[in-house]
A protein has these predicted regions:
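Bacterial N-terminal signal peptides that target proteins for export
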Residues: 2-17
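Alpha-helical interaction segments
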Residues: 19, 118-123
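C-terminal motif of bacterial Sec signal peptides marking the signal peptidase cleavage site
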Residues: 25-28
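Bacterial signal peptide processing site
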Residues: 30-33
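Start-of-domain marker
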Residues: 36-51
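Amphipathic, charged alpha-helical segments and their helix-to-coil junctions
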Residues: 50-88, 93-95, 100-101, 106-120, ...
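Short, well-ordered alpha-helical segments
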Residues: 121-138
């Protein structure tokens, strides 16, 4: 009987050791998996936010869609609203080809003769766009030491959407500074 109790105790210790080792391994796997999912989710979240924000602004439908965005609230929503409200003023300049969207997600002047007249309007729009890209980066989990890298990713993700969703005839500037009509 003594041997049976001793072997049960040894067996119990092995079980606990096995469970502990399994838990350690699962924890390590979970951290890797969570990290990989986090990176994937941040990229997908950024692209989704870009698609939704650009669509909301270009379509100029109800701002009720603001609550439907993947990431919204507070100052981010206010920046999106300002861009939404400013768009009717920008639209004729896009349509005449005086301004265009850049690959990096900003608005630039195509016709230098209009630069002074459009300076403040574009400064306001680009300030809000930069803020949207920063806040989207923070919202997807890159608000720490990776913020500056992720802001660049976000600005180009948004830039792609500004260009892709623009009507035919609007101008876009690529990363090399070349302009093409959509």
């Amino acid at each position: 009987m003594k041997n049976a109790v001793a072997s049960f105790g040894l067996s119990k210790r092995r079980s606990f050791l096995g469970i502990g080792l399994a838990a350690l391994l699962l924890t390590a796997c979970e951290n890797v998996a969570v990290h990989n999912v986090g990176v994937h989710t941040a990229a997908s979240g950024t692209k989704l936010e870009a698609r939704q924000v650009v669509s909301l602004i270009y379509k100029q439908e109800s701002l009720d869609g603001l609550a439907e965005l993947a990431y919204s609230g507070g100052d981010l929503s206010r920046a999106i609203k300002r861009s939404y409200n400013r768009f009717p003023e920008l639209k004729p300049h896009f349509e005449r080809g005086l301004i265009g969207n850049t690959a990096s997600g900003f608005v630039a002047v195509r016709e230098s003769s209009q630069k002074d007249a459009l300076k403040q309007l574009l400064r306001d729009e680009n300030t809000d766009r930069a803020y949207i890209y920063t806040q989207t980066s923070v919202a997807v989990g890159h608000g720490n030491d990776t913020l500056s890298l992720w802001e660049k990713y976000a600005s180009f993700a948004f830039g792609k959407e500004w260009i892709a969703q623009a009507p035919a005839g609007w101008w876009a500037q690529d990363e090399k500074g070349n302009w093409t009509a959509r």
